[in-house]
Amino acid sequence: MAPAWSLLLALLLLSCNAICSLGCHLPHIHSLANRRVLMLLQQLRRVSPSSCLQDRNDFALPQEALGGSQLQKAQAISVLHEVTQHTSQLFSTEGFGAVWDESLLDKLRAALDQQLTDLQACLRQEEGLRGAPLVKKDSSLAVRKYFHRLTLYLQEKRHSPCAWEVVRAEVMRAFSSSTNLQESFRRKD
């Protein structure tokens, strides 16, 4: 009887190890969710970008954090989470609802919340496999500083419609870069 239990236990441990070693694979549906967020951000455009040319600014999008070749998959998940979280916080800011259609904002927030839930589950899974937090401090700090610059810009411009348009376009750029990063890792899998 003992050898049968030993065999079952060994098979269970091997199958768990095989499943756990797969790591976090963001499903194709998550990629579609990213595209949905980009589509919603595009639909939010209310001001012609050409009328806001004088308001444009270089916010120094952290390309190394969003697409650097040195970024490992686990760290990329952390960066994707950071970008999504800051985007969600930015579009939950008080006092800008008058600029955009509230129903579109609700859809955007819901899509971002779903992505955060997916990414948090992924982070927990990856951290469980590695036993340590995944955050690469340089990348995380670069993303936080980038979104801080966007927030300061909005305050400086008093949340004007043109300022929000510039920020909306900039967030689309950041989100597009994070989507490209995610898809590059998905192709490698």
Swiss-Prot record:
Location(s), subcellular: Secreted
GO biological process terms held by the UniProt record: adaptive immune response; B cell activation involved in immune response; defense response to virus; humoral immune response; natural killer cell activation involved in immune response; positive regulation of biosynthetic process; response to exogenous dsRNA; T cell activation involved in immune response
UniProt keyword Lipid metabolism present: no
Annotated disulfide bonds: 24-122, 52-162
Pfam family, one: Interferon
Signal peptide: 1-23
InterPro entries: 4_helix_cytokine-like_core, Interferon_alpha/beta/delta
PANTHER family: INTERFERON ALPHA-5, TYPE I INTERFERON
UniProt similarity note: Belongs to the alpha/beta interferon family.
Known role: Produced by macrophages, IFN-alpha have antiviral activities. Interferon stimulates the production of two enzymes: a protein kinase and an oligoadenylate synthetase.
Name listed for the protein in its UniProt record: Interferon alpha-F
Organism: Bos taurus
Origin organism lineage: Eukaryota, Metazoa, Chordata, Craniata, Vertebrata
